[in-house]
Amino acid sequence: MIHNTVLEAVGNTPIIRLRNMTGPEDAEILVKYEGLNVGGSIKTRTALNMIDDAEKRGLINENTVIVEPTSGNQGIGLALVGAVRGYKVKIIMPDSVSEERRKLVRHYGAEVILVHDNGNIGLCIEECVALALRMRDEDKNVFVPQQFENPANPEIQRQSTGREILSQVNKPIHGFCSGIGTGGTITGIGEVLKAANPDITIWAVEPENAAILSGGSIGTHVQMGIGDGVIPEILNQEIYEDVCIIKDEEALDTAKLLASKEGIMCGISSGTNVAAAIKLAKKLGKGKTVVTVLPDTAERYFSTPLFED
């Protein structure tokens, strides 16, 4: 098959069974490896669907400047889509995100605008959003997809990722867990999996230093892409029954083990998700199946503690 653009290759990522990270009495863990997606993360799906939706609704045209506040992967995804579709893109990011994220956005031809993270990621994200909305108010050509409240975000997880998981696993799924960034992944996939098995156990996952769903304090953490210190508008808070809190050290150690024990190169938030999945697998026990998502690839974390000896 010949694709007319790289965007036609988005999705259909593999499901992989973890063979070396669970005990004999634990449930099996299956991971949806989005690091192999076009653009290296699950967010390419979201970026493409938000732009497709905006085009269909006549919200953008050849003069549009796409501006989005993000802690990383969504910006990379939008920069990629903009490169293919011919849109000018500006990405507003906390200055605490990895250097690789910034470079990837620029590599796709987009502009990076940094906002200082003064130790509270929630306030920083709010400042990023406020700046994007000011830019929109000052320029009629600016379009802000607003991933935290755009229904096209969870919808693509329902229509693509969730359905892919059901088809690939092709047996009952007893547990699912996902870190909370925009809330699109856990909402979209969670709703699909719960429709297939109403008895499924679903956990939301948060960094210890940004556990807003659990009523914790908001600081800065290394689990980039989740734990933005806000409760997203699109998050279905009825879809999960519990919240699992993961320390930075757990996330980093688990991501490193995924590489050294399973040969899977993935980012820090993938370590977060798998650390939670291991806890859920122990709770559900042998004979059950737990699914989680590996949101991105490791190569955008060389400058972070993930690659420290």
Protein language model regions, located:
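PLP-dependent amino-acid enzyme catalytic core
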Residues: M1-D309
